[in-house]
Amino acid sequence: MTDQTTRLPVRRALISVSDKTGILEFARELQQLGVEILSTGGTYKLLKDNGVNAVEVADYTGFAEMMDGRVKTLHPKIHGGILGRRGTDDAIMNEHGIKPIDLVAVNLYPFEATISKPGCDLPTAIENIDIGGPTMVRSAAKNHKDVAIVVNASDYAGIVEGLKVGGLTYAQRFDLMLKAFEHTAAYDGMIANYMGTIDQAKDTLSTADRSEFPRTFNSQFVKAQEMRYGENPHQSAAFYVEAKKGEASISTAIQLQGKELSFNNVADTDAALECVKSFVKPACVIVKHANPCGVAVVPEEEGGIRKAYDLAYATDTESAFGGIIAFNRELDGETAKAIVDRQFVEVIIAPKISQAARDVVAAKQNVRLLECGEWPAERAAGWDFKRVNGGLLVQSRDIGMITADDLKIVTKRAPTEQEIHDLVFAWKVAKFVKSNAIVYAKQRQTIGVGAGQMSRVNSARIAAIKAEHAGLQVQGAVMASDAFFPFRDGIDNAAKVGISAVIQPGGSMRDAEVIAAADEAGIAMVFTGMRHFRH
């Protein structure tokens, strides 16, 4: 068993980096500690020009760089120095004049940045595939018992601190080794993903008209948390986040207080946050079992998120119990007090949490309070995944959304201005309700949500029941459906409960029949031409 606390000093280091962030300071610290530095190409020039003593690898090996820099470090004096086992390979190393290299600081050619540039062609992409770098990284990682490998600039300071007290422990070197293999795995995966999108059936291979989906799919996620259990207590679970952070989300949120997030907390909070992101004006979304059970939008001058919370809660006070609450504005103390005084809540999430709100919620120690940061108005494109037994379904994110200008009026009566506001609001909510989804709304407040039914008509019936149970008036409300109505019965039922306007994708074989039903009832109906199934 290796002693994890024994420190090994560093006498010789090899530095060769593409990303030169912090490398000068790191090299200067190594030099002050008496470490001999070997370096290559641009890194060597940077160090030399800034007064850091370094030996160029070509001078050290006696073998000049060649093939436009393709061959620099691929030499026995380099890899023997990295891979040589101290106490086992000393004799053969001495015989061939190979000196041990105790630390390797390497990061790789910027392949991702290169292929992200407009007009990047295949030869350019290929030239930015690093060979010597990954080889050194893997060699040093394999021999981490004797060698420290550093691929992240964020580790430089910790390494220097360790060297100042006698060297790096095995535990430190093991952690650096793991980071190194994660680094090369992500790098190789990125290359395979990119090359796997090129159409091999064409006579000339080109990066033009690449497929959206690679032949094999590689992605890297980092474990953020091990959970007590999964969706159910008999299931084990962990939460992994994308290695490269994107827009504000549940994966980037900071937990300010409360119990550890559960598997279901994460899933439900994601649903709530993604829904509330859809709104520009102050909004509140309450979610239970990944379905919105109450949503409202209220302009600042009419009460903002404080009023929006009241209206969202009023939609379904029973389902809101133990729910997740999301806002698209800073959570203030008054709104926080209204929540904790009124109901049991699992999670509250907002882009920012005021100190007053933190002080209020602190009295409820179990409430999970999350701050996720601001998000851009434009939603980032990306992929969504759904696991099936033995496979993975991959699709582009459903970031499609409509405005009033996109609506196609298909009935004799056009919707009023207020109805249009409510229709667009209800449509945004319906996108986040499990199919079949029906949403009743009035004055930009949900008054009934029917979710997850096999029959669209039954979802509509549930929405009406929810509204009646909450004491909310359906008469004059609008209705949103995430997919088209296959028969007129959905409209007939809407007319019976007092729905005044309907928004739906359209596209049914019986659209004419459905439109006729709306006209008979004096209902205004608009088509979006866009479906929002959610399973």
Curated annotation (Swiss-Prot):
Query: HAMAP family under this entry?
Result: PurH
Q: What is this protein called?
A: Bifunctional purine biosynthesis protein PurH
Q: Write down the PROSITE patterns for this protein, in alphabetical order.
A: MGS
Q: Which InterPro entries match?
A: AICAR_Tfase_dup_dom_sf, Cytidine_deaminase-like, MGS-like_dom, MGS-like_dom_sf, PurH-like
Q: Which GO terms describe its molecular function?
A: IMP cyclohydrolase activity; phosphoribosylaminoimidazolecarboxamide formyltransferase activity
User: E.C. number, please?
Assistant: 2.1.2.3, 3.5.4.10
| The record's note on its domains | The IMP cyclohydrolase activity resides in the N-terminal region.
Keywords, alphabetical: Hydrolase, Multifunctional enzyme, Purine biosynthesis, Transferase
Q: Which domain of life is it from?
A: Bacteria
**GO cellular component annotations of the record:** cytosol
- List the source organism: Pseudomonas putida (strain GB-1)
